[in-house]
Structure formats: C-alpha cells, structure tokens
C-alpha cells in the first residue's frame, strides 16, 4: 500500500495544497488517541462534537485537522470542508 500524505488528502477532498507535504501516520476520529503525524477528522455526534477538542488535538501533535465549523477553520493545521463525515467517507473510498 502506498504511503498516505497530506497532498493526497487535500487533492482527494478538493482542498488547497499545503505549502509543505507531510506524511500521515494515521487517520483518527478519537481525540484521546492522537499521536504525532495523525490527521484528525472532527466528527459531530449525538453527545459530543469533536470540534470542541481540535485545539487539544493540534497540541498533541496532529499533522492536520479536518473541520467543518468556521470557528476552527482559522487554526493553524485546520483544513475546512463542508461536512467532515462526508469528507472522511470520500477519503476512505479514494484510499481503497
């Protein structure tokens, strides 16, 4: 399997290319499980909205966070999409 990188994610999700491509270790949706090199998708659930934890995720070493809320979009490392769940599904389909 080819390695995953930030350029592939941005290209797949129709986002602007980053100034510097970076390898991605994992795709993560649990903010408690972040490691250096992860990309975090901030999903909104019935009880929690992961956007509330985006700053913590970035501080824990995430390479990038995929967000849909405007208040998170300005953070360094944030990539804004319309719908984070749809973006995660699109990335998964492209990666198969």
How would you name each of these model-derived features?
Residues 1-90:
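N-terminal leader/targeting and accessory segments in enzymes
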Residues 92-96:
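Walker A (P-loop) phosphate-binding motif
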């Amino acid at each position: 399997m080819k390695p995953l990188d930030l350029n592939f994610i941005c290209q797949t999700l129709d986002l602007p290319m980053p100034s510097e491509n970076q390898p991605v270790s994992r795709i993560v949706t649990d903010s408690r499980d972040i490691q250096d090199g992860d990309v975090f998708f901030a999903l909104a659930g019935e009880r929690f909205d992961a956007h509330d934890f985006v700053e913590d995720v970035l501080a824990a070493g995430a390479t990038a966070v995929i967000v849909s809320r405007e208040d998170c979009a300005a953070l360094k490392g944030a990539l804004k999409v319309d719908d984070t769940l749809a973006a995660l599904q699109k990335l998964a389909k492209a990666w198969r």
